[in-house]
Swiss-Prot record:
Main localization category: cytoplasm
Species whose genome carries this gene: Rattus norvegicus (Rat)
Similarity comment text for this entry: Belongs to the gamma-glutamylcyclotransferase family. ChaC subfamily.
Cellular component GO terms held in the UniProt record: cytoplasm; cytosol; trans-Golgi network
This protein's name: Glutathione-specific gamma-glutamylcyclotransferase 1
Description of how the protein assembles with itself and partners: Interacts with NOTCH1 (via extracellular region).
Location of the region described as Disordered in the Swiss-Prot/TrEMBL record: 1-25
InterPro entries, A to Z: ChaC (IPR006840), GGCT-like (IPR013024), GGCT-like_sf (IPR036568)
Length: 222
C-alpha cells in the first residue's frame, strides 16, 4: 500500500528569482482577475473568460481529500474531489483564467455557488506561474477546501479513495470521470507536470476496474 507523502508533485527545475506577482484586482472592484483551477475547472470552467494559461503554483500539493455530496457524489455516498494542501515542497499544475469587466462579477457569482455553496470551498490568493512565462508570475484567486468545512474527508489510503471514486456519482457525472479527466490534463501538460498522489489513485482504480473507462468527450489543452 502506498504511504501518504507530504510532497508528491515534482516542480519544474529551479528558476532564477522572479519579480513579485502583481495583484490582478484592487479594492474589491476588480477590472481584471485571474482564477486558478486545479480540479474540474481545468476542463469545465463554465464561465466566460478573456484569456487562459496552463501553469503551476508552488507551495501546495493537490489531494483528493474533499468530500462532494452534489457534483460527484450524494449525501449517502460522498464523492472525492481535490483541494490544495499547504506544502513548501509542493507544486500543483492547473489553468488560470483571466476575467475582465463584466466577466468578473459573473464568474465570481457563478463560482460562489459552484465551489463555495455546493462545494464547501473558501477563496485564497495564490501565485501562479504560467508554463510559457514562469518568470512572469500572476496573482490568482483559488478555491481551497480546508479541514474546517463539514464536507472535508481528509487523508485515506489510495485504494480506499479509489474505491470511493468508483462507487460515487453526482449531478455533474461520475466521480471516475472527474479523476480521469484530471489525469488526462496532467498528461497533456508534459513530463515536467507530475502528481504522484493522482497517479497512485489512477493506478489503484486500474487494479479495481477490470475494463477501461473512456471519457465521453476528448480533453483538449486550453
Amino acid at each position: 500500500m502506498k504511504q501518504e507523502s507530504a510532497a508528491q508533485s515534482t516542480p519544474p527545475p529551479s528558476l532564477s528569482p522572479a519579480p513579485s506577482a502583481q495583484p490582478s484586482w484592487e479594492d474589491g472592484d476588480p477590472q481584471a482577475l485571474w482564477i486558478f483551477g486545479y480540479g474540474s475547472l481545468v476542463w469545465k470552467p463554465d464561465f466566460a473568460y478573456s484569456d487562459s494559461r496552463v501553469g503551476f503554483v508552488r507551495g501546495y500539493s493537490r489531494r483528493f481529500w474533499q468530500g462532494d455530496t452534489f457534483h460527484r457524489g450524494s449525501d449517502k455516498m460522498p464523492g472525492r474531489v481535490v483541494t490544495l494542501l499547504e506544502d513548501h515542497e509542493g507544486c500543483t499544475w492547473g489553468v488560470a483564467y483571466q476575467v475582465r469587466g463584466e466577466q468578473v462579477s459573473e464568474a465570481l457569482k457563478y463560482l460562489n455557488v459552484r465551489e463555495a455553496v455546493l462545494g464547501g470551498y473558501d477563496t485564497k490568493e495564490v501565485t501562479f506561474y504560467p508554463q510559457d512565462t514562469p518568470d512572469q508570475p500572476l496573482t490568482a484567486l483559488a478555491y481551497v477546501a480546508t479541514p474546517q468545512n463539514p464536507g472535508y474527508l481528509g487523508p485515506a489510503p489510495e485504494e480506499v479513495i479509489a474505491t470511493q471514486i468508483l462507487a460515487c456519482r453526482g449531478f455533474s457525472g461520475h466521480n471516475l470521470e472527474y479523476l480521469l479527466r484530471l489525469a488526462d490534463f496532467m498528461q497533456l501538460c508534459g513530463p515536467q507536470a507530475q502528481d504522484e498522489h493522482l497517479e497512485a489513485i489512477v493506478d489503484a482504480v486500474g487494479s479495481l476496474l477490470p475494463c477501461s473507462y473512456l471519457s465521453e468527450q476528448p480533453l483538449a489543452l486550453i
